[in-house]
């Protein structure tokens, strides 16, 4: 298990907390883009607002998914072919954790995402977080 996942969760929580201030809410982007090169989500942490969208652009040679963790308040599972694009609309504020189920797996015992055996980046599971702040 990598230390990066807990660090990402702490960073996402801090970012979500900061989104509650009036200044941040008025300057938050409504839409975000996540690029998928070489079995990674970049940026790992994205910011949007309720009613906004996150567009995932697969710049990799193989297909990927953007899959919510089991038990998430909002479930999603987008399959994105190589070179494809998919968009996710965010209707509720919160931190949306996701991963690629083709290249990583979720362990409910540890609440962590880990890279699958043979992954391009075994120390960095293919996972990310979207932080959606209340709009307005």
Predicted regions and their residues:
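A mature extracytoplasmic/lumenal domain signature
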Residues: 38-40, 58-60, 70-72, 92, ...
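Bacterial N-terminal signal peptides that target proteins for export
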Residues: 1-8
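Short, compositionally biased
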Residues: 67-78, 118
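C-terminal motif of bacterial Sec signal peptides marking the signal peptidase cleavage site
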Residues: 15-18
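N-terminal edge beta-strand
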Residues: 27-50
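Extracellular/periplasmic metallocenter environments
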Residues: 80-136
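Beta-strand cores of secreted/periplasmic/IMS beta-sandwich domains, seen most often
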Residues: 43-62, 67, 84-92, 96-98
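Bacterial signal peptide processing site
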Residues: 20-22
């Amino acid at each position: 298990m990598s230390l990066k996942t807990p660090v990402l969760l702490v960073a996402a929580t801090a970012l979500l907390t900061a989104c509650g201030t009036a200044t941040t809410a008025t300057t938050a982007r409504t839409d975000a883009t996540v690029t998928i090169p070489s079995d990674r989500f970049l940026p790992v942490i994205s910011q949007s607002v309720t009613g906004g969208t996150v567009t995932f652009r697969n710049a990799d040679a193989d297909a990927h998914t953007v899959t919510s963790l089991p038990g998430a308040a909002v479930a999603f599972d987008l399959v994105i072919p190589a070179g494809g694009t998919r968009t996710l609309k965010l209707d509720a504020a919160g931190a949306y954790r996701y991963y690629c189920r083709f290249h990583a797996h979720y362990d409910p015992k540890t609440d962590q995402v880990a890279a699958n055996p043979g992954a391009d980046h075994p120390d960095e599971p293919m996972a990310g977080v979207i932080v959606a702040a209340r709009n307005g």
